[in-house]
């Protein structure tokens, strides 16, 4: 399996596996970028963890305004799970693991067009989102 911290790195894993003629190896990434979502549709990447950047932007702006006013950030929680267990305030937004089974979620959200997500996909073996 190839577990990557970003979809860009996952693309490198997919390219390396392809160069070796290896198929069916689970590969994960994060970001929900267009190339990765296309790889999910093609079946060369198993999952991309997506966080809607519009939600991230809204929450970041709201947090910045609260902090500028000297207020606590609504919804922030204390998190101390790092290697040194240093407590800090954090907000965790919903992450969506996008697979071939729910690829339509990012299309319906307007994050990517169906044409871009499904480019080059064989219609006979296509996930439901590409039919």
PLM segments and residue spans:
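Short beta-strand elements at the ligand-binding edges of bilobed clamshell
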Residues: 42-54
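Hydrophobic alpha-helical
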Residues: 1-39
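Structural signal for conserved beta-strand scaffold positions within catalytic alpha/beta enzyme cores
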Residues: 29, 49-50, 99
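Electropositive phosphate-/nucleotide-binding environments in soluble metabolic enzymes
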Residues: 7, 54, 58, 91
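Hydrophobic alpha-helical segments within soluble ligand-binding/sensing domains
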Residues: 33-36, 52-72, 76
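Hinge/cleft segment of the Venus flytrap/periplasmic-binding protein
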Residues: 63-131
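Sec-exported extracytoplasmic/periplasmic mature domains
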Residues: 14-22, 41-45, 62-69
